[in-house]
């Protein structure tokens, strides 16, 4: 049995599978006799914050730290290093954020409260999308994996900017000042070629507390810390960035994201009607993900190639691009996260319907995206 468990965690798709399981368990519990206990647990206060708050602001800061590390590595030595390799996924990502947001706004423009959720379908769940792609194993060209990874990373970077600009509450000048000082300290450490990770993490913890108290969303501290970690070590040392990225990845994939999914996907269907499910808010979210993502990514990619602005990566055709663009409609954890920022406890009914829209759109995108990708790829060689 232990060998089976070990083999499971070695699978590329394991993280995505765990996300599905965690979300499914949460939905079952939330709609059972244990539903009240589930909600009571999430709203239990520990050290001044609810369990839900610790997960969304604390654990997710670690997830965003990993995103920061990945983005920096890709910018310095990966798929985003040169203009030639970065421009195609960058253009695709812009389309993939713009079209879903516009579809959502088209459905909800006359509701001032609902319009706050315009960014919900703009996000892509990188772990889930890569997990679905990994189910097809070696049939997937490396260049297609790199395209999806680069696109999703740029998408995540866009989400970080959106959170910073549009989903930050009343700001505390003192806390912000401390945050800016700690940001300066982190990058000064980098400039002085300090490579000891513990120093960055202690400074980063102080930054996280300052950002948490400032009114800017605390997860952004994770991105700043990630960008401050040096890529290159001193002579004879391993890369601090790669070391931390490698160390964090299993915890994020197999613990943090499943815990986040469990804490946020448990939606009680009590009182939810068919009329509510087909109302403008969930429809805007679901169609933004399921239709907006492929429409934006594919059309912007096609236009970029036809106008000579970018080239298709080697070994990839437009059938592959369309299949991947549908997969990018899996918003799931990232979309749920933005929904909690847009509506949260202030408008729980809107948050519930937004999350139902996320589940509908993401599930449809996952099933169709997998099917299209499977059809577009060559059969596995014997």
Swiss-Prot record:
Regulation: Activity is regulated by pH. Active at alkaline pH.
A Pfam family this chain is assigned to: Na_H_antiport_1
Record note on disruption phenotype: The growth of the inactivated mutant is not restricted at various pH and NaCl concentrations, although it is inhibited in the presence of LiCl at pH 8.5.
UniProt GO molecular function: sodium:proton antiporter activity
Cell membrane is among the record's keywords: yes
GO-annotated cellular components: plasma membrane
Entry-linked InterPro entries: Na/H_antiporter_dom_sf, NhaA
Factors inducing expression: Induced by sodium, lithium and potassium.
Gene3D superfamilies tied to this protein: Na+/H+ antiporter like domain
Keyword annotations from UniProtKB, A to Z: Antiport, Cell inner membrane, Cell membrane, Ion transport, Membrane, Sodium, Sodium transport, Transmembrane, Transmembrane helix, Transport
Record keyword Transmembrane helix present: yes
Membrane topology term: Multi-pass membrane protein
Biological-process GO terms, alphabetical: regulation of pH
Transmembrane stretches, start-end: 14-34, 47-67, 87-107, 117-137, 146-166, 171-191, 205-225, 247-267, 271-291, 296-316, 321-341, 353-373
Record field: catalytic activity: Na(+)(in) + 2 H(+)(out) = Na(+)(out) + 2 H(+)(in); Li(+)(in) + 2 H(+)(out) = Li(+)(out) + 2 H(+)(in)
Localization per record: Cell inner membrane
NCBIfam families: NhaA, PRK09560.1, PRK09561.1
Function text: Na(+)/H(+) antiporter that extrudes sodium in exchange for external protons. Can also transport lithium. Contributes to the survival of V.cholerae during the stationary and exponential growth phases in a saline environment.
PANTHER family per record: NA(+)_H(+) ANTIPORTER NHAA, SODIUM ION/PROTON ANTIPORTER NHAA-RELATED
Family (UniProt): Belongs to the NhaA Na(+)/H(+) (TC 2.A.33) antiporter family.
Protein name: Na(+)/H(+) antiporter NhaA
Species name: Vibrio cholerae serotype O1 (strain ATCC 39315 / El Tor Inaba N16961)
Originating gene: nhaA
């Amino acid at each position: 049995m232990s060998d089976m468990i070990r083999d499971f965690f070695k699978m590329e798709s394991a993280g995505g599978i765990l996300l599905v399981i965690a979300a499914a368990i949460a939905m079952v519990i939330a709609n059972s006799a244990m539903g009240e206990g589930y909600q009571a647990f999430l709203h239990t206060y520990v050290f001044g914050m609810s369990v839900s708050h610790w997960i969304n602001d604390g654990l997710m800061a670690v997830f965003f730290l990993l995103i920061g590390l990945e983005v920096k590595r890709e910018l310095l030595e990966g798929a985003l290093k040169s203009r030639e390799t970065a421009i195609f996924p960058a253009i695709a990502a812009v389309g993939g954020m713009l079209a879903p947001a516009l579809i959502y706004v088209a459905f909800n423009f006359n509701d001032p409260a609902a319009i706050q959720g315009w960014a919900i379908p703009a996000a892509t769940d990188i772990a889930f999308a890569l997990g679905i792609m990994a189910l097809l194993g070696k049939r997937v060209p490396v260049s297609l994996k790199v395209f999806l990874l680069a696109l999703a990373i740029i998408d995540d970077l866009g989400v970080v900017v959106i959170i910073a600009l549009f989903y930050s509450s009343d700001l505390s000048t003192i806390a912000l000042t401390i945050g800016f000082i700690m940001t300066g300290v982190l990058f000064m450490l980098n400039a002085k070629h300090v490579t000891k990770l513990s120093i960055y993490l202690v400074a980063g913890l102080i930054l996280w507390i300052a950002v948490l108290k400032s009114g800017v969303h605390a997860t952004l501290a994770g991105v700043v810390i990630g960008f401050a970690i040096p890529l290159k070590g001193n002579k004879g040392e391993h890369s601090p960035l790669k070391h931390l990225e490698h160390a964090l990845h299993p915890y994020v994939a197999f613990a943090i994201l499943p815990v986040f999914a469990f804490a946020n996907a448990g939606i009680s269907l009590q009182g939810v009607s068919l009329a509510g499910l087909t109302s403008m808010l969930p429809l805007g979210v679901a169609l933004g993900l399921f239709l907006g993502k492929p429409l934006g990514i594919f059309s912007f990619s096609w236009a970029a190639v036809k106008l000579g602005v970018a080239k298709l990566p080697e070994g990839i055709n437009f059938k592959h691009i369309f299949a991947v663009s549908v997969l990018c409609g899996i918003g799931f954890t990232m979309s749920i996260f933005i929904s909690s920022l847009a509506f949260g406890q202030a408008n729980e009914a809107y948050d519930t319907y937004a999350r139902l829209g996320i589940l509908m759109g993401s599930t449809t995108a996952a099933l169709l995206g997998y099917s299209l990708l499977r059809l577009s790829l060559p059969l596995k060689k014997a």
